[in-house]
Swiss-Prot record:
Principal EC category: transferase
Keywords, in A-Z order: Glycosyltransferase, Transferase
EC numbers, comma separated: 2.4.2.1, 2.4.2.2
InterPro entries xrefs: Ppnp, RmlC-like_jellyroll, RmlC_Cupin_sf
Enzymatic reactions: a purine D-ribonucleoside + phosphate = a purine nucleobase + alpha-D-ribose 1-phosphate; adenosine + phosphate = alpha-D-ribose 1-phosphate + adenine; cytidine + phosphate = cytosine + alpha-D-ribose 1-phosphate; guanosine + phosphate = alpha-D-ribose 1-phosphate + guanine
Gene: ppnP
Gene Ontology CC: cytosol
Job description of the protein: Catalyzes the phosphorolysis of diverse nucleosides, yielding D-ribose 1-phosphate and the respective free bases. Can use uridine, adenosine, guanosine, cytidine, thymidine, inosine and xanthosine as substrates. Also catalyzes the reverse reactions.
Species name: Syntrophotalea carbinolica (strain DSM 2380 / NBRC 103641 / GraBd1)
Family statement: Belongs to the nucleoside phosphorylase PpnP family.
Protein name: Pyrimidine/purine nucleoside phosphorylase
Pfam family, one: Ppnp
Listed CDD domains: cupin_PpnP-like
Gene Ontology molecular function: guanosine phosphorylase activity; purine-nucleoside phosphorylase activity; thymidine phosphorylase activity; uridine phosphorylase activity
Length: 104
């Protein structure tokens, strides 16, 4: 899906890691949420409350998923899921464009 229709967009950015990771929240009519964001090169760790699906829209990232011992590469057009109440780490070598879907 390259566009979303009939949604509410929160104008204020979600800003992490001194502005190196930013996103905007999109709320759908059924109450589900997604964020659309950009990550600049660096290494980041995030905690999850809800389960998430991270879809790569551009660029690439190395991901260390919860319980994993090896890093996995994800590129444009690929996605991965992160369980609720967990933590995952990212290594970004080039600008990464992403869509994060929060699962209920």
């Amino acid at each position: 899906m390259s566009e979303f229709k009939n949604v509410t967009l929160i104008k204020k950015a979600n800003v992490y890691y001194d502005g190196k990771v930013t996103s905007r929240t999109v709320i759908f009519a059924d109450g589900t949420k997604k964020t659309l964001g950009i990550m600049m090169p660096g290494e980041y760790t995030f905690d999850t409350a809800a389960a998430e699906v991270m879809e790569m829209l551009g660029g690439s990232m190395e991901v260390l998923l919860p319980g994993a011992e090896t890093w996995q590469s994800f590129h444009e057009g690929q996605s991965f899921e992160v369980p609720a109440n967990s933590q995952f780490s990212l290594k970004i070598k080039e600008v990464a464009d992403y869509c994060c879907s929060y699962l209920k």
